[in-house]
Amino acid sequence: MAEHDAPPESGAARSPPAKKRGGDARSPQQDAQPLSSRDRVRERDEDKDRERHRRHGEDRERYRDRESVRERGEGSRDRERHRREHREESRDRERHHREHREGSRDRERHHREHREGSRDRERHHREHREGSRDRERHHRDHREGSRDRERHHRDHRERSERREHRDRSDDRDYRRSCDRDAERRDRDRDGHRRHRSRSPLRSESQSKRMSGFDQRPSEAIPILAPDATPSQLPELPAANPGMFPNMLPNLVNVPALGQPLAMTQQATRHARRVYVGGLPPIANEQTVAVFFNQVMAAIGGNTFALGHAVVNVYINHDKKFAFVEMRSVEEASNAMALDGIMFEGAPVKVRRPTDYNPSQAAALGPSQPNPNLNLAAVGLTPGAGGGLEGPDRIFVGGLPYYFTEAQVRELLETFGPLRGFDIVKDKETGNSKGYAFCLYKDGTVTDIACAALNGIQLGDRTLTVRRANQGAEPRPEQENILLQAQQEAQMKRLVYEVGRTLTTKVVCLTQVVSADDLRDDEEYNDILEDMTLEGHKYVPHSTIAESFIIRPHAKFAIRPKLTEDTNLFHLDLTNHMFSSLPFCHVHVCSY
């Protein structure tokens, strides 16, 4: 095979056939003659040379073919290698682009997390500002209540002074009248005795009698019974001409009761007002007044057949609440049954105002709604509202904003089961406003709970626990246990403080790693370090007391320096750190 692959020798390839020698030239006559053995040998040699020359030509042709095939094969391999290198370069470029895109996504995720952190900080600041506004509103309400009480006391003093002044004036008028009657009788006796004509003084006396100033009416004025209705008013005598000019022109036969009526309205104002909360932004004084007038008429809550139940409406548009002043105490009590009624597509709360005094209101009229009200006419269920009304309703202020409803309930139910509970939340954000209202099933524990919980320090805030109706007085059966309540208050505070020091709360993260990943100590330390560094991105390092992993349960725990920060840690880690891990679970536990 090697012989065929090797190129033929150039000398053998190019050697022409051997020429016949001159002596060997033969004539045609000689050719016709039989060849000799030498000639035959020579011809055979020539044939062999020609055959060898032909084979060499074929070998050269095959060699050229193989060379061309080999060159074509090497070119194909070069092209294949070139294509393979091109594909590898393309893959390298694609991998570079993919890494660049991943880096861009990481940067975008970092920016997004930074923006979310900024929004969280802004939300925290906003909640702090809202809490400040709530505290300011509470102080303002307290100041308004103080001003109302001061105004009430001032009105009471003024009424007392006017009453005393009127009594003194009546005494002076009575003494003057007696003196004038005695003087007139003396003058009459002197005139009859001296037989003199009427003097100017007597004429002056007679003119006084003509004015009717010092004379009793010819008919006694009937006294109105306390329980008389307007339809039972007795017929009064016609007024003398010239008396009380320009006063009550359309009510000739009605006595002047303006000042006592105003005094009565002022005294009953606290019992005739109702608080309406949760108003929609489009509400105004007119729409609220028209709505309550129509609803009161629909349920049969009006005490008078004519006129409207609403006298005045005051709206605080910023806080979305209003004070609605009713015409009578009974109508205000009937309006309490409208708690939860739909107004402009939103349910509203109907409550007593903070200056409502149940003990004083009990003497002015009914304090509960009429049981015969037709609440079904306005889509309400009898007995559904007013679950937190009554003299034993408790106001709980100063709650930390991160306290959940369950935590507040747990704190309050240490004194007994609750009949009603309502934690006030912001309608837009749903976050707690830091105060709540509750009502115990057993009213005898109301003052005990107030005395025990008031003044307790929760985090950076101090609880304010008192009766919601500041004017409400303890029930008679509660007066004997007030001393016991004060003694138990100190014990409650002590138990609560001890419980806080013995309980250690941590934020626990589960389903982050498996138990097999923690078998190796070196891997355990690496995972703990990574988790701790990741946690410090969202939780301030200065507020962390300890971080550890519980083996073999594969639970990563962070213990804050302050127990009150546990809920903040829980919220931050839930919203940020493991949002990309759908199976991770973050919760608060004790150890």
Swiss-Prot record:
GO terms for molecular function: poly-pyrimidine tract binding; pre-mRNA 3'-splice site binding. It is found in: Nucleus. Keywords: mRNA processing, mRNA splicing, Nucleus, Repeat, RNA-binding. Transmembrane segments: none annotated. GO terms for cellular component: commitment complex; nuclear speck; U2-type prespliceosome; U2AF complex. The keyword RNA-binding applies. Residues 37-79, 157-191 have a biased composition (Basic and acidic residues). Residues 272-355, 392-470 form the RRM domain. Residues 27-36 have a biased composition (Polar residues). InterPro entries: Nucleotide-bd_a/b_plait_sf (IPR012677), RBD_domain_sf (IPR035979), RRM_dom (IPR000504), U2AF_lg (IPR006529). It comes from the Eukaryota. GO terms for biological process: spliceosomal complex assembly. Its main location: nucleus. SUPFAM superfamilies: RNA-binding domain, RBD (SSF54928). Residues 1-215 are annotated as: Disordered. The keyword Nucleus applies. Belongs to the splicing factor SR family. N-terminal RS domain has a very strong bias in favor of D over S. Necessary for the splicing of pre-mRNA. This is Splicing factor U2af large subunit A.
